[in-house]
Amino acid sequence: MGHLGGGVDAGVGASGHGETDGLTQHGGQGRGEDPLDGAQPGLGGPPGEEGAVVGQVEADAWHAPIEPHRLRASTRLAAVSTTTLSVDCGGGGIKASVLDCEGNIISRAVRTPTPYPLPPEKLVETIASLASQLPGADRVTVGMPGMIRHGVVVATPHYITKDGPRSRVLPDLVEAWGRFDMGAAVSRALGIPSLVLNDAEVAGAGVVTGHGLEMIVTLGTGLGNAVFDNGVLAPHVEVSQGPVRWGLTYDDYIGEHERLRLGDAHWSRRVRRVVDALRPMYLWDRLYLGGGNSRRITAAQLAKIGDDVVVVPNEAGMTGGARCWDMARP
């Protein structure tokens, strides 16, 4: 396990499956038993199961990923002075900052708790409020949980609830969010081009090297993921809402509620088992573990998780906001 200190529009997220449909730029539980302990191949196994022990890469050894192979040549010169407002919308908080053309943060980040209940218009207003506290930008990237296609929200797991994750789902919010054109709404509110993506895709854009098949799993309020093939966002199944056992989803199994209930040691063991389960499904060249909770994985589990896995900083959810504009489609 290594440490690094430091999508583009996929149709996957809250529904548990989907396809990448292309990129559109808009103008203008209390459970005492681990359900996966020995329950399924690849997910079980004894807690002391051995894995590869690898070295730690210190935070100051981090260098920006190399440029993906497939970038739109026409955007390279145009992007020299382009600034991007990057907004990371999570289940517990929403933060924003301004990036230069290379994805470097050039303004202090501003943050606000995610306001619930949260209809689409309220999220747009929240983004506009954060933007008003920052320098002006040429374009905006919004990363948010859920299935996003061409900037349109197909489904979102958190924002349809009364008080946030694991609270009651409100039918009116399900209807309001279904097929809401978030990209167009944000562009109208801010008066600049917008790109609205799944939040794991934005984070992945900030860390991938452009070599081989790379996957990111983000650990926060829930679980997010994205897959990149030679620097290009690839069609992928969103595992967060996939079933584990006893009606649990992966969000339930290793989300923030379970981490708080179990403690970091037991929760970290679950994370390792999820990685072990996903590895034969994706056969990645490299897996990145990001999100706010990636830093909470214990050293004991990091030592067993494999040298094809790298922990990356939570800031990737922000810094990827610039790079994802230049990621070409196959």
Which role fits each region the language model picked out?
Residues A10, A14-S15, T20, T24, ...:
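Short linear motifs in low-complexity or flexible loops
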Residues T75-E125, R166-R168, V232-L260:
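Short glycine-rich, Thr/Ser-proximal phosphate-binding strand/loop in the N-terminal lobe
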Residues T84-D88, A137-T141, E214-T218, Y288:
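Short glycine-aspartate micro-motif
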Residues G93, I148, L278, Y282-P313:
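Glycine-rich phosphate-binding loops at beta-strand->alpha-helix junctions
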Residues I94-V98, G146, L223-D229:
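Short beta-strand scaffold segments in enzyme catalytic cores
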Residues A176-A200, V232-R273:
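Glycine-rich phosphate-binding loop plus the immediately following alpha-helix
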